[in-house]
Amino acid sequence: NLLYLAQLKGVIGKREVEEAIQRVGLDPADKRVFGKYSMGMKQRLVIAQAIMEKPDVIMLDEPTNGLDEAGIKEIRQLIEQEKERGALILLASHNQEDMKILADQVYKIADGRIERKGTEL
């Protein structure tokens, strides 16, 4: 699925796609259709898609949702690595622990308005 997407965009090759898949803890040789994956594996594939082109800005919505404790730790480490690479991470989450661990700035938004902002809420 990801290789096909990359080929459509024409921006990266097989090696970059496989690297992104490995970085999220999946096996590049696994050829299942997206719908056959568990929720946690789908979440990992979505994150692989977000990072495979090494973008300057990465938008993630509930990146640890559906993952077990080991998976949560792996994805948090991956997000930290992307931050160290210089990527700006925009993270939407209801998970307070994710915000404490990953966020430099936190915004509480309700009804489309910023209610509070800071390093913690």
Cite the ranges covered by each PLM segment.
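Short loop immediately C-terminal to the Walker-B catalytic DE motif
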Residues: T64-N65
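Catalytic Walker B motif of ABC-type/P-loop ATPase nucleotide-binding domains
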Residues: I58-D61
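Conserved ABC ATPase "signature" region
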Residues: L3, I12-A29
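Conserved catalytic motifs of ABC-family nucleotide-binding domains
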Residues: K54
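H-loop/switch region of ABC-family ATPase nucleotide-binding domains
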Residues: S93-H94
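Hydrophobic anchor residue at the start of the ABC signature
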Residues: I47
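Helix N-cap at the start of a conserved alpha-helix in ABC-type nucleotide-binding domains
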Residues: E69-A70
